[in-house]
Amino acid sequence: MKVGFLVSSVSREAGGLFESVRGLAKAVTCASASARVFGISDEQSAVDLQDWQPLSVETFQPQFRAWGYSNQLAPAMLGADLDILSTHGLWKYCSVASQRWHRRTGRPYIMHPEGMLESWALRNAGWKKRFAALLYEDRHLRSAACLRALCEAEAQSIRSYGMRNPICVIPNGVDLADLSETPKLQAHAFADDRKILLYLGRLHPKKNLANLIRAWKQTPDSHRGDWVLAIAGWDQAGYEHELKQLTRDYGFTDSVQFLGPLFGQDKDAAYGVCHALILPSLSEGLPITVLEAWASAKPVLMTRECNLPEGFAVGAALQIGTAPEEIAAGLKQLIEMSDDDRRAVGDRGRTLVATKFSWPRIGEQMRSVYEWILGGGTTPESVRL
């Protein structure tokens, strides 16, 4: 079975999709399928292509970068003799290329909205998305043989958007971290013995980091004096400047530190040295950063909008709200826990990843959906008709 993976970027420019699509393609390959990856090149592609090895990856120069348009993309897909196509993300030229491939070959594709049909995401730059939906995206969604949701909440969002296709509910995955290795955060070593509360991801308003900093302000000095809030990520639309100004206004130049974007070994080291992860998001699909923290046996503070209720159910995460006072309550709970209790929360997260979010398990689930689409037979357990 030849599976194509189509994504607008194969580099860190794709954000969380860089990890999730790469992991899924490798997992599907391990589950007795061959994978070919197609994407648009960008400034980081040459650096990050090595992370896709041993997969076959083809990138193409864009003529219209903002939309991800390349006139070489669709012909390359048509020449690849794929059995099925896996398309990731919305609102870009990839959606048009996917439909063109489908019409020309008569072969099916699975559409992965990647959380982009959540209500908050649809409202963000809403008029542009409504125009794209009318022009091509709704047709692209309706024509998919199956839509993949990362969680039950996303499946409900897809139905609320009006799609009636079959939906497979299959989460993202991660690999378990090697806890025997001593982490070394080379570029951002902390010189003192304070505990580290890590945020890792895009610096974007939907991540709700301004309210996190306001919550840090509400936390008494006696609680946060032994901690540092480390914010790691890449700026979007100037949000980093707003956050840094807020920390200066509060006098937090020491207890709140901005690490910049972390990838590869630096990112792994950040998970290794931190004592907990926080994700106060207003909207998510299924955040891979939480899974990565659990894979490193770290406790997590997160909102219910992160769509990982399993973490709350097994005691691997502390639930926080999105308002500053609600986040502050979670910070107080975390800080007042003993080291042993925090470790126990992280250990439960690692066990959860091993049992539900491992890539081998997810690769098998996805392969069963491919086989069902191509050959019929028994409906996989993950599919909602």
Which residues are covered by each model-predicted region?
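Aromatic "clamp/platform" in nucleotide-sugar-dependent glycosyltransferases that forms part
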Residues: 282
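Membrane-proximal helix-turn-helix segments that form the acceptor-binding/catalytic region
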Residues: 104, 130-146
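A short, well-ordered alpha-helix in the C-terminal region of glycosyltransferases
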Residues: 341-356, 368
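Glycosyltransferase donor-sugar binding loop
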Residues: 39-44, 174, 200, 228-244, ...
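Short hydrophobic beta-strand element within catalytic cores of glycosyltransferases
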Residues: 299-303
